[in-house]
Amino acid sequence: MAESLKKLAKSESLQALQDKVTYWVNDYNSNSCDQNLNYCIELIEQVAKVQAQLFGILTVTAQEGGNNEGVETIKCRLLPLLQTSFSSVNMGKTAESEMCATQDFQLRSKNRDNSPDQDQHQSDNESFSETQPTQVQDDLAESGKSLEGAKNGSTISLLAAEEEINQLKKQLKSLQAQEDARHKTSENRRSEALKSDHRSTKRTQDQRPQDVVSNYEKHLQNLKEEIAVLSAEKSGLQGRSARSPSPSTGTRSHRRGRSRSHSRSRSHSRSNSPCTTVAKIRSPSPNRAKMSSVARKAALLSRFSDAYSQARLDAQCLLRRCIDRAETVQRIIYIATVEAFHVAKMAFRHFKIRVRKMLTPSNVGSNTDFETAVSEYIVCHLDLYDSQSSVNDVIRAMNVNPKISFPPEVDFCLLTDFIQEICCIAFAMQSLEPPLDIAFGADGEIFNDCKYRRSYDSDFTAPLVFYHVWPALMENDCVIMKGEAVTKRGAFWSSVRPVMRCRSRSLSPICPRNHFGISTVSRSRSPSPIRCTFARY
């Protein structure tokens, strides 16, 4: 219906009809009778077309209303209208016929030539008025049939829609039942999984206290064993120190043999000691554990600076009692410092290996956690370092060093305190992250202003290092503290002497024999293997 109505609105038939009526009114007096009749017939034809379209729209509208709707409206309004129009048409026909009879009689005398045309138009109008009611009745019958068919079709479609709705409701109920069943099964599975997880967590929680208790028992047993071993070692060391004579009263050979036997016995005792085979866990010192790496580094740098400014000068004073040459004294102290760092680094490596062996059975974490535990243990147990053994190793290395030429009466045991302090500093520096170490130095190398400062008696224009007074302290490749070196132009080549395999056996006439550190019996030394002149210095 909407499409037919849109077509009627777009065709503008009613507006064209109104325009024609207006045009006919304006030209009615100037037109002839035939022209006016033609205008009237055209208007009737146009009205008939519009009426036919309206009847089609009426039929479609009635079909949309169904079998019951619109019937009363058609009966009440359309049928009476059609009846009145038919009766008015008939009455108008008689009146018009009478009027036409009188008018025809009057006009026949005037327009005898136009009478046949007028009769023909009149007969056409009469025939059209007679056929129009029959056409309207036929249209009504057709519209009734179409309305009945539309009603039957609508009832059928309504029944089909109701059946489809019922089927959809049944499907919806089945889907809801399936969804409820799935939800129940998923909830049951989740509850079972939660129960199993709760049971597993309970089991693990029950097992963890047992493991913790066993670990604590092992730890306690290890502590007891370590305390017993350390107390035994302490008593042995105290008895040994009480029985050992002063290092300056015996002969050099006796001291050397004693140091060798002592070192062998200590190495043997260390190898057989339970502390070396399986090191025990000690409770960390609270003060040392609280110290951060930065604080320990600052403290070690301060100790190293104090060793340069105070301990080095004290050692020089001790050596100057027996040696007049300042160059030899400074060389001895530099070599002692370098050897102390070397021996302390080796001792730190062995100590770290023992700690790893000790902590390996109780390690349950990753490698990083294990290394962290090893480092923390070493930091908290730096007092376990055997510095006296390192001092003996340093003195042995100095005795066979070919670069030191000095009177044989001077014993390097004079530098025991200095060497022990340097060994402790170097050992503690290896526990830092990153560790600190001294720079490599060799006689005759090019002077590096970033590593060393020149001594007061140096030639400040000389490019080569004559000898080193104090090593530079390094952190990776960065200089932390500068060392000290002596530079002299041309003095290095003039001072080169043949390398001596052993120290001289002749007595020194420089100092009296009653001075500290001078032996009454000459001491011979066995030849030592030739070392590289530039090794570690």
UniProtKB/Swiss-Prot annotation:
GO terms for biological process: mitochondrial protein catabolic process; mitophagy by internal vacuole formation; positive regulation of cardiolipin metabolic process. The modification Phosphoserine is found at residues 13, 85, 123, 127, 154, 157, 283, 285, 508. This is Mitochondria-eating protein. It comes from Mus musculus. In testis, expressed primarily in spermatids. Residues 252-269 have a biased composition (Basic residues). Induction: By p53/TP53 and p63/TP63. Directly activated by p53/TP53. Pfam families: MIEAP. Residues 152-184, 210-243 form a coiled coil. One of its GO terms (cellular component) is mitochondrial matrix. It comes from the Eukaryota.
